[in-house]
Amino acid sequence: MSFKMNRQGELSLSFSFILAIVIIAAVIGVGFYMISYFLGLRNCAELGLYKRDLQIKIDDAWNSEETRESYTGAVPRSVEKVCIGNLSSVANSADYAEIYDKVARFDESGVNLFYYPNPGGNCKIVSGSLQHVRFNGFDCIDVVRGKATVRISKGAFDSTVLVTP
């Protein structure tokens, strides 16, 4: 018995095969997009956690009589510097003048924590506001291997906490 396949059968088989390849490619593409999206959310979460944990350390120092300690927190590797200070003050170093000019556009009331460069992506966190603090001008902290360290100090008669690089 001889089986003969007509032209329509050959065409529908190849169309199904091509459709399956297109669907597989679409699923893989969506998968890569979702992975990159969630990695972007991870970076955003790290920025939020850095600010929150730093504020907790500042609050602990503010509530204590006297303190001198450091805080080291994780930030995304895309961030090169964490800058602190009021934009109404002058940058403490000529090295930070360019950064100061770039973050000056985020001059909102009370904003005194800045991430440079802007993390971009899905993350809209580019600055934050720390409470109960004072600064010696505008300074930046270098991010080393995804970690940024600041010094926190408060004297017995101080009403605010001094945060320095």
Residue ranges and their predicted role:
Residues 5-8:
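Sec/Tat signal peptide C-region and signal peptidase I cleavage site
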Residues 2-3, 15-165:
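Long, compositionally biased, intrinsically disordered regions
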